[in-house]
């Protein structure tokens, strides 16, 4: 039996493996149209590129987050249960105290997870408000109590002074997602603010030498070509970590009952992200357990080298102990 040849576009993309240079837009758009067994060939290439050039040096970058203020958000992001514009049934509370943050951070450190993120609902902090100063005090306390734990934050849109203060207080990474191709943000995500608010925040953070964790969400009504546009937008913003979320439709939000996204499209998105970003950390976030289910390991073999463990903001995740076993098993493919 004759061997089945690789698709010509995949053969062309193998240059990334040799050079470490990203594929061009034209080739990325073409690869996004692959179907059937060719998708697995694409995934295999992305996995090889990750192992040779990836940002996590062959290991898996794991992080855990804490929802430090929940709900009553002024923004109308269509997928989000925390928006005050929607009717999702979630826990609502103000900023938690430092003892609650320390409890979760200690648990994260005890489980061998290197990065811990403080996340708050809301538009963000344009000035050094009383609440923002409370968060800075939390960060200082975490550094004192857990000096080996990398402290991260996701606090929404930031003004110049808050961004500078986060740098002064030693934040390791800041998460703020552009979510989709920028030109479709207002239509697919929110119209109470603009994607430029987020992009300006990213630029402020980078000016202050803070590493940025910036990703998106797939399955909100975008097309594959627009996922490719989003992936290239990450390159323009000089981000360090790219978390990709898969929509988990939540009752009470505008996207409840969404039909979902084909699994091969998800695999292609992760693989293309790796081929465009050979050296970045690419992380699986929401949807890993609930959407991918039995196939979540496939994403780790399609270019991803990071994951969010221990749960999400308003949806359950998987126990960290189970994820540690998952990460050990994945080493067989390195």
UniProtKB/Swiss-Prot annotation:
InterPro entries linked to this entry: Aldolase_TIM, BATS_dom, Biotin_synth/BioAB, Biotin_synthase, Elp3/MiaA/NifB-like_rSAM, rSAM
Domain Radical SAM core, first and last residues per copy: 55-285
PROSITE patterns named in the record: RADICAL_SAM
Annotated [2Fe-2S] cluster binding sites: 152, 213, 283
Keyword Transmembrane attached: no
UniProtKB keywords: 2Fe-2S, 4Fe-4S, Biotin biosynthesis, Iron, Iron-sulfur, Metal-binding, S-adenosyl-L-methionine, Transferase
Stored Pfam families: BATS, Radical_SAM
UniProt keyword Iron-sulfur present: yes
Cofactor(s) needed for function: [4Fe-4S] cluster; [2Fe-2S] cluster
Binding site for [4Fe-4S] cluster: 73, 77, 80
Cofactor note: Binds 1 [4Fe-4S] cluster. The cluster is coordinated with 3 cysteines and an exchangeable S-adenosyl-L-methionine.
EC number: 2.8.1.6
Broad class of enzyme this protein falls into: transferase
Catalytic activity from the UniProt record: (4R,5S)-dethiobiotin + (sulfur carrier)-SH + 2 reduced [2Fe-2S]-[ferredoxin] + 2 S-adenosyl-L-methionine = (sulfur carrier)-H + biotin + 2 5'-deoxyadenosine + 2 L-methionine + 2 oxidized [2Fe-2S]-[ferredoxin]
Function: Catalyzes the conversion of dethiobiotin (DTB) to biotin by the insertion of a sulfur atom into dethiobiotin via a radical-based mechanism.
Subunit architecture: Homodimer.
Protein name as annotated: Biotin synthase
Organism: Chlorobium phaeobacteroides (strain DSM 266 / SMG 266 / 2430)
């Amino acid at each position: 039996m004759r061997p089945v040849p690789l698709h010509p576009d995949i053969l062309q993309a193998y240059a990334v493996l040799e050079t470490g240079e990203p594929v061009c837009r034209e080739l990325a758009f073409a690869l996004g149209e692959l179907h059937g067994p060719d998708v697995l060939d694409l995934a295999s290439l992305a996995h090889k590129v990750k192992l040779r050039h990836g940002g996590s040096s062959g290991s898996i970058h794991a992080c855990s987050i804490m929802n430090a203020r929940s709900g009553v958000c002024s923004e109308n992001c269509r997928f989000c249960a925390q928006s005050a514009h929607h009717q999702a049934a979630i826990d609502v509370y103000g900023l938690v105290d430092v003892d609650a943050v320390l409890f979760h951070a200690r648990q994260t450190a005890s489980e061998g997870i290197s990065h811990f993120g403080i996340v708050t609902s809301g538009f963000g902090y344009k000035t050094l408000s009383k609440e923002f100063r409370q968060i800075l005090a939390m960060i200082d306390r975490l550094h004192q109590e857990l000096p080996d734990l990398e402290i991260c934050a996701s606090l929404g849109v930031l003004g110049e002074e808050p961004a500078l203060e986060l740098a002064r207080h030693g934040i390791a990474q800041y998460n703020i997602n552009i979510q989709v191709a920028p030109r479709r943000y207002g239509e697919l995500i929110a119209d109470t603010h603009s994607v430029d608010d987020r992009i300006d925040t990213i630029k402020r953070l980078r000016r202050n030498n803070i590493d940025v964790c910036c990703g998106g969400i797939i399955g909100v009504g975008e097309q594959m070509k627009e996922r490719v546009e989003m992936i290239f937008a990450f390159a323009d913003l000089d981000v360090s970590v790219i978390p990709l979320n898969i929509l988990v439709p939540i009752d009470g939000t505008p996207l409840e009952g969404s039909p979902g996204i084909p699994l091969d499209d998800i695999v292609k998105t992760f693989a293309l992200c790796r081929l465009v970003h050979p050296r970045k950390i690419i992380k699986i976030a929401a949807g890993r357990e609930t959407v991918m289910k039995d196939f979540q390991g496939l994403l780790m073999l399609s270019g991803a080298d990071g994951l969010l463990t221990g749960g999400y903001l308003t949806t359950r995740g998987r126990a960290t102990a189970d994820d540690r076993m998952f990460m050990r098993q994945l080493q067989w493919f390195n």
